[in-house]
Amino acid sequence: LLLRLLAASEGRVFYQGEEITDASGARLNQLRRELQIIFQDPFASLNPRMTVEQIVGEPLWLHQNMKKADRQYRVAELLKTVGLPAAWAGRYPHEFSGGQRQRIGIARALASGPKLLLGDEPVSALDVSVQAQVVNLLESLKHQLGLTMVIVAHGLAVIRHMSDRVAVMYLGQIVELATVDEIFDAPLHPYTQALIASAPQMQPGVERDAPLLQGDLPNPASPPSGCRFHTRCPYVTDECRQVEPINQVLDGGRQVACHRWQEINRDRSVIQIAPPSAAFLRRRALFEHAATHSSLPSRNS
């Protein structure tokens, strides 16, 4: 919708304070030069009948009417920028690996000199061994070229590595918006807390109980009334079932859409994402028993 590849059925799209929902003609062409996308599947997003030079050079011809010699030079520069030899410009997509194809897709997205780059799950279709390389490339390009990037992803590691601000969505609605550190270290919304707590821990022997979500994911085409998360939320009330929460803006521009976020987070540190583990509760019980009795209970008590 942001790139106008699909028309919005409702709502409005704003870019730099300007509504672009119905942009057309010359303005739409300008927007498509400024807004580019890295598609999710590098095996489907490149035309198998076109060479790399044609794929990367097409935006240069469409948006800048660049002559062939100049296009060839610019394509060589772009390939070097994404870590590919310029000599590969005459090859076809089937001659490359998935990671190399995604680099070609990134070079094509950069060709028009965009101001904003949208990454639609840019590494999810790649092998894990290649994902880190592409993520590091995008991070480097962001700083090198001064790009604004919008990354759509479900991988928490990718989000934490690449993001400055994070919007957490559930059934098509933003439930929390905050800096990356706030989201990962001190989530406020129950869904965000469950999401972060679900990440595997890399500390052997350390127990961490995630708040389990009950029920199945509702049909996005027919979302529940009130708060869309209420069918799975452990803190649900009648208000949650009936009244849709608004985004409450907190200090620093942080936003959370939850009726009970203050109550939920009042009596505990929001940095502690999961409830205390069973092992922790057992140790605390032993400590409290020792404080009031002369001897500790046995292991079988």
Q: What kind of feature is each model-predicted range?
A:
Residues 4, 115-208:
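P-loop NTP-binding/switch modules centered on Walker-like glycine-rich loops
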Residues 11-19:
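Conserved ABC transporter NBD signature motif
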Residues 19, 69-87, 196-197:
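Conserved ABC ATPase "signature" region
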Residues 20-36, 54, 62, 68, ...:
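ABC ATPase NBD coupling module
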Residues 33, 94, 112, 136:
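Conserved signature/switch motifs of ABC ATPase nucleotide-binding domains
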Residues 92-96, 100:
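Conserved ABC ATPase signature
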Residues 177-287:
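Short catalytic/signature loops enriched in Gly
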